[in-house]
């Protein structure tokens, strides 16, 4: 199945892209996808808390993805 991934902030800068298109196995969950993204980052996202949104709605870790879903990895907002 094809999934579009939107990257923001630290994820965007670490991966060097604001959007990825991946082909994943059916039954992949958001937590499995997060693990894959962290592996692609070679440890640079270790310790970074990420929120996951599927089709523009925050989703639990074990949400099963479907073909054509848009997934966003959103680090916490920081500011002063």
PLM feature spans:
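Ubiquitin-like/PB1-type beta-grasp interaction modules and other compact soluble beta-rich domains
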Residues: 1-79
